[in-house]
Amino acid sequence: MTTEAAAKTVLPDTLVSALNWRYAVKKFDASGRIPLDKWEALEESLVLSPSSYGLQAWKFLVIEDKALRAKLRPASWDQSQITDADKLVVFLVKKDAGPADVQRFVDRISEVRRIPAEMLEGYKQMMTQSVTLPSEKVEAWLTRQVYIALGNFLTSAALLGVDACPMEGFDKDEYDKILGLHAQGWKSVVIAAAGVRAPDDAYAKNKKVRFPKSELIATV
């Protein structure tokens, strides 16, 4: 696909209409299902999400097991989206990311782009400097990247006509414990439920409340 063709794939009105249509669904239809082709496209939207350096120090845990989701619900302020949405995605950040993660990424670049590893040495050193900063700074930096993926997921869902709800209202420590994340080297950051809005979700009728563009966007 050419750059011009890609730019014409989604018309401006289509994008704005989709963003106006979407909202943070508070009540899902428990029987609603996302078509397989749309879900596969949404998974691709996660894989293709941008990250700093392209490092991808994240993982996206799709939880379909109903029993497991029932265990997670009490750790989510008993919000019904956890059990009623067709899909539940837990966005994870890599714990203690370091030089080994950089090397893995460099190896992947070399493989995909057929570039000799030695030609990537400068890039590797730059990334290594970033991941060897104090651990709290590295974790904060990588956590911010996860929110980029969340935004990409939500926009993609809107364009596909798939309902979703981003959620920070959950006990991260409890999630990590229930899902056994720490032992696997991961930490939960944010979650997103996706599915079909319930016909009686009152929030669907609410008008969007946004400040005027003139107050939010400045051109200098």
Question: Model-predicted segments: where are they?
Answer:
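Acidic, surface-exposed loops and disordered segments
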Residues: 1-220
